[in-house]
Amino acid sequence: MARSGYTLPVFACAAAIAALQHLKNLQAELDPIEGPLHSVTLDLINPPQTVEIAIEQVAKLGPGTALAISRSDPGDNLDITRNTPIWAVVTWAEDQQLDSIVIEGGEGIGRLSSTNDRAAIYAYAQHLLQTNLQKLLNSTEKIRVTIILPEGRSLAQRTSNAAFGIVDGLSLLGTSGISQPLSAPEQLEQFQTQLQQKAEQRKHLVFCLGENGLDLAQKLGIDTACLIKTANWIGPMLVAASLEGVEGILLLGYHGKLIKLAGGIFHTHHYVADARQEILTAYAATLGLPQTDLNVVFNSPTTEAALQHLRHLDQTTGSQWVAQIYTELVRQIDQRSQTYIQSQTNHRVIIGSILFDQQRQIIVSSPGGTALREQVTMA
């Protein structure tokens, strides 16, 4: 059985707790010994459980400042952050600081290019840090927390972060503290078990490939009881949903991933098949995009870059290429997904799709996607 681990925000939080505890001990004149601090406990919040996280080192850096170091352990997941160190620097803040806890991203934490280079520390990580650290503060104490990933900048070069507008480092992303081994065969069984449980309560579900989709879904007000994480197993999950009697499925995903379904590719890992530019170019060609622009789309380094070219073309010429091409893409995604399900189960399931860009802005929603979104949105 594959071993689960913890997500990056958990280790950042553990290091911050250790650094704050060190400061509290200094403040109480307990004269703590600097060096290894075996572990700290923290509340994951999601799921609601307390865990113990190892701490490698803790030390005083200066007056009112301490540093603690943890190390990432994502379990058996194929994760590039395995064993990477996570630093947290905690400093007593001045009285004029309005908030009791201010969280900042230091070296190796990515910046969101779309939001004035704000640190890529997302909602779950913020909530995790705020909740666990607040428990250690009295009503008058204030701290400033800086999270540092010494290897973050170099590790980010091996990710698709840039496609989501995250530059210069990694993000503290996720909606859960548990890191499941997405690449292990057992993971598909876990996804299908979760689907079976939710299908007993809901007849309309939302499939999200990863954390970006799950995060956007919650911001859109979609009922979390309808959310299913599929990773790259879209085909098997569509079939499983059909066999469980699900009546409608909303596919919510990054256009650079879901576009593969328009080409009949139902396992979306790039090691299996990566024809994103070819699919986008083919649909653009059938709709009459000029040859010069087809060449640009085909040779773009990412689907995001190709989308930006089409948007620029629309802005400068008054054309509607983005709307035309992406409307056809979601139509085909819906149709091919329904055909795929029927070929495997002989059942008919309503499919709708919504594609978003790197800034998590919706590009297009199919008619089915719009209708299903209404079905799964909380009142």
Swiss-Prot record:
Q: Name one GO biological process term.
A: anaerobic cobalamin biosynthetic process
What Gene Ontology terms describe what this protein does at the molecular function level?
cobalt-precorrin-5B C1-methyltransferase activity
Q: Does the keyword Metal-binding apply?
A: no
Q: Which pathway, metabolic or otherwise, does it act in?
A: Cofactor biosynthesis; adenosylcobalamin biosynthesis; cob(II)yrinate a,c-diamide from sirohydrochlorin (anaerobic route): step 6/10
SUPFAM superfamilies found in the cross-reference section: CbiD-like (SSF111342)
Name the Enzyme Commission number(s) assigned to this protein: 2.1.1.195
Q: Which UniProt keywords apply?
A: Cobalamin biosynthesis, Methyltransferase, S-adenosyl-L-methionine, Transferase
Top-level taxonomic group:
Bacteria
Catalytic reaction list: Co-precorrin-5B + S-adenosyl-L-methionine = Co-precorrin-6A + S-adenosyl-L-homocysteine
The Swiss-Prot or TrEMBL record describes its family as follows: Belongs to the CbiD family.
Return the protein name.
Cobalt-precorrin-5B C(1)-methyltransferase
The gene behind this protein is: cbiD
